[in-house]
């Protein structure tokens, strides 16, 4: 271990290089960030806030993450989960305004959050997905969605 550490120091081999050159190892996995694991762009289940519940269900089924993010001009307005809909299944019509069912302030993390911390948040809050925003949008009220992390992505990467 001493020899390996000395060589790493002399060669200026940082933890970040470990992440690049040895991504499947324990050190590489421990350095993964939210932005390394999230889905982006056309893989994200999103819908305009003016759409109805039927359109949201179609998007949710198409993207298969169990959620749909409600957007207004690219800004996060809320989130609807398959669990939200199951709990209300006897009380809605597919033509209803989906804002009636949405969580208005969903859990949001920044892109540079360690993936292991994202998993800890999911476990603590008993949720399966987190919305990811850029570091400079985290404290803003109008957050722009950058990606989505699902708990299965974290487990697939061996995050603990």
What name fits each language-model region?
Residues 28, 36-38, 49, 58-62, ...:
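Short, conserved, surface-exposed binding loops centered on an aromatic residue
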Residues 20, 39, 87, 91, ...:
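Phosphate-coordinating loops and pocket residues in cytosolic domains that bind phosphorylated ligands
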Residues 1-12:
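Short alpha-helices
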């Amino acid at each position: 271990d001493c020899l390996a550490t000395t060589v790493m120091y002399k060669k200026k081999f940082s933890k970040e290089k470990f992440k690049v050159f040895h991504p499947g190892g324990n050190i590489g996995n421990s350095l993964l960030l939210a932005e390394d694991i999230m889905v982006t762009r056309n893989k994200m289940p999103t819908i305009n806030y003016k759409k109805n519940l039927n359109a949201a269900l179609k998007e949710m089924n198409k993207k298969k993450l169990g959620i749909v993010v409600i957007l207004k001009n690219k800004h996060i307005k809320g989130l609807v989960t398959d669990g939200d809909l199951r709990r209300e299944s006897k009380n809605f019509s597919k033509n209803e305004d989906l804002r009636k069912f949405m969580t208005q302030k969903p859990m949001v993390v920044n892109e540079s959050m360690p993936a292991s911390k994202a998993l800890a948040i999911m476990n603590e809050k008993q949720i399966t997905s987190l919305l990811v925003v850029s570091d400079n949008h985290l404290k803003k009220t109008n957050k722009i969605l950058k990606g989505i992390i699902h708990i299965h992505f974290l487990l697939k990467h061996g995050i603990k």
